[in-house]
Curated annotation (Swiss-Prot):
GO BP terms: maturation of SSU-rRNA
Family: Belongs to the RbfA family.
Organism listed in the record: Saccharopolyspora erythraea (strain ATCC 11635 / DSM 40517 / JCM 4748 / NBRC 13426 / NCIMB 8594 / NRRL 2338)
NCBIfam families xrefs: rbfA
Name of protein: Ribosome-binding factor A
Pfam families tied to this protein: RBFA
GO cellular component, one term: cytosol
């Protein structure tokens, strides 16, 4: 089993070799707008996954995938010559979705900022609902001769027993 540090170093070197191979050796015009973003190697150093991005629309993505599939043999032999490992890893090219995900997150954050600004704008012009004092205030009746002790005892009893009809 290989060292994970060695696998990381080999992956970094494979990404460099593939990027320079696409720039200088492979002369396919469909690969003009390709950027190699990352490479990952399995711990046994037999398989490498190379991640790439393409500037363009979906048709450009499809044509780039086909061009990379046709250039895999040339790039693999170049990797084998320049790395010096016993077994040259097989290359698999995968479109990198990180830029698309980042763009989508930026859009969602912008929508959240707009919603927050709208809430802040509505809150600045909002008024309180109801009275200034939203809590119920007991009013004292002027015709009641008691000091309010009976009303207070009655309200405490109502709270304990619950409301009664009649």
């Amino acid at each position: 089993m290989a060292d994970t540090a060695r696998a990381r170093r080999l992956a970094k070197r494979i990404a460099q070799i593939v990027a320079s191979g696409l720039e200088y050796e492979v002369k396919d015009p469909r690969l003009a707008m390709v950027t190699i973003t990352d490479a990952r190697v399995t711990p046994d150093l037999r398989d490498a996954t190379v991640y790439y991005t393409v500037f363009g629309d979906d048709a450009d993505h499809a044509s780039t995938a086909a061009a990379l599939a046709s250039a895999t043999g040339v790039l693999r032999s170049r990797v084998g010559q320049q790395t010096g490992v016993r077994f040259t890893p097989t290359l698999t090219f995968v479109a990198d979705t990180v830029p698309d995900d980042a763009r989508r997150l930026d859009e969602l954050l912008a929508q959240a900022r707009e919603a927050d600004a709208e809430v802040a704008r509505l809150a600045s012009t909002a008024e309180h609902a109801g009275d200034a004092d939203p809590y119920r205030v007991d009013t004292e009746d002027d015709d009641d001769d008691t000091d309010g002790a009976d009303a207070e005892a009655r309200s405490d009893a109502d709270v304990r027993r619950g409301p009664q009809s009649g």
